[in-house]
């Protein structure tokens, strides 16, 4: 229950499903103890940004956090656009760039200007991504960050991303209000599948 001491919304993987949060709990925060006395804390800016929340076991379920900015435990990963971390100086960010990217941090910040979180979550929640993950994971029940990094992200014109963004917000709204969103989810999944189809110019090469 939210009170004067337990002020920060908190999630675990069992609290989320595709495009929805099923349950919210509250942690002590902004007190003399927390977060100042936490052991090995992650950097605050990771949580205080719009992000995609991803479970790390079983079938992938992603939801959008573009308002509340939840805290979460180790059963969840979160994905933040590089442009939204511009100016944040942190050793783990520098290490990630050096270890996992062929591009500079500045380049990735520029690349991320061309996509929105709604577009990325639509890809991650798609049937196509589920197939790719099944291939990447084999018999492994875990979803690791490298699995997510290895999902190719097709480029899409802004008009397509705008339509996808609208559908994502529609699905989220329908789920929050208990409305049937099957038709919207089907349309969204078909749009994502279409993006992965080779175009005629690719087939002629």
Language model feature labels by segment:
Residues 1-159:
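Polybasic, glycine- and aromatic-enriched phosphate-binding surface used to engage nucleic acids
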């Amino acid at each position: 229950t939210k009170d004067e001491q337990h002020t920060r919304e908190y999630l675990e993987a069992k609290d989320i499903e595709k495009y929805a949060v099923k349950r919210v709990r509250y942690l002590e925060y902004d007190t003399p103890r927390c977060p100042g006395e936490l052991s090995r804390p992650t950097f605050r800016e990771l949580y205080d940004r719009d992000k995609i929340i991803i479970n790390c076991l079983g079938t992938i379920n992603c939801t959008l956090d573009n308002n509340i900015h939840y805290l979460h435990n180790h059963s969840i990963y979160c994905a933040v656009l590089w442009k939204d971390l511009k100016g944040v100086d942190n050793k783990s960010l520098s290490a990630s760039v050096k270890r996992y990217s062929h591009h500079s941090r500045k380049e990735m910040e520029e690349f991320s200007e061309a996509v929105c979180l709604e577009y990325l979550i639509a890809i991650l929640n798609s049937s196509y991504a589920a197939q790719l993950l099944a291939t990447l994971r084999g018999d492994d029940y875990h979803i690791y960050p490298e699995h997510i990094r290895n999902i190719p992200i097709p480029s899409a014109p802004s008009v397509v991303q705008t339509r996808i963004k609208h559908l994502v917000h529609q699905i989220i709204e329908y789920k929050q209000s208990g409305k049937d969103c099957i038709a919207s989810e089907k349309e969204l999944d078909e749009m994502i599948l279409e993006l992965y189809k080779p175009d005629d110019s690719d087939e002629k090469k």
